[in-house]
Amino acid sequence: MFVLKARHLMAAGLVSLAAWSAGAQAGAIEQLNAFVSNVTTARGEFVQRQVKGGANGSPLRVAGTSSGDFTFSRPGRFVWRYLKPYEQQLSADGQMLYIYDKDLSQVTERKLDASLGSSPAAILFGSNDLAKNFVLKEGGTKDGIDWVELTPKAKDTQFERVAIGFRAGELEGMELRDAFGNTTLLTFSHIQKNPQLPASAFRFVPPKGADVIKQ
């Protein structure tokens, strides 16, 4: 999503029943387009796994697991919360992005436009103009999940490849691979599509005593 390093995700995710029922016969790109076009708000849960290995035939291993929940309202408003094994929150109100690390009692603040762009967060929380920032390609079907591969058009992004998977129109997961060969896997569950969400749900107020760093 924005920056998947240290303790950050980049951070990063649902449409009317009739539209999503048709997704069972649709290709992955068509399902993705339906997701970004028709899902204006959503909330759900996620599990994030950091995967190592795979080079030169070495076995894959899970190096770390975290979990939490998310809420979003297109375009550009979201809350992405890590709850286990540590607490961290990424919040965006449509203009600014706030990254709050509870253990460090620190808030990092930056303009959202500079953070979204060609990041994986743009797929889940941005506008529906994915072709502007990504090259889309069908990624095939594995274990019943249809995958879309998205390659950022910009050359200065942290991620060289992003994949997003759907099962019969339902959002299932994302795979993020950075320029160093590290892979992050996200699986989604308990997704509620198009709930009514007030603007106040995305308003972030730094906790009392927290250090605020503006970038």
UniProtKB/Swiss-Prot annotation:
Subunit and partners: Monomer.
Biological function: Participates in the translocation of lipoproteins from the inner membrane to the outer membrane. Only forms a complex with a lipoprotein if the residue after the N-terminal Cys is not an aspartate (The Asp acts as a targeting signal to indicate that the lipoprotein should stay in the inner membrane).
Disulfide bridges in this chain: none
Name recorded for this polypeptide: Outer-membrane lipoprotein carrier protein
Gene (name only): lolA
PANTHER family found in the cross-reference section: OUTER-MEMBRANE LIPOPROTEIN CARRIER PROTEIN
Organism: Ralstonia nicotianae (strain ATCC BAA-1114 / GMI1000)
Localisation per UniProt entry: Periplasm
Segments passing through the bilayer: none
Similarity comment text for this entry: Belongs to the LolA family.
Source domain of life: Bacteria
Signal peptide from the UniProt entry: 1-24
NCBIfam families xrefs: lolA (TIGR00547), PRK00031.1-3 (NF000661)
Gene Ontology BP annotations: lipoprotein localization to outer membrane; lipoprotein transport
Record GO cellular component, one term: periplasmic space
Keywords (A to Z) from UniProt: Chaperone, Periplasm, Protein transport, Signal, Transport
InterPro entries: LolA/LolB/LppX (IPR029046), OM_lipoprot_carrier_LolA-like (IPR004564), OM_lipoprot_carrier_LolA_Pbac (IPR018323)
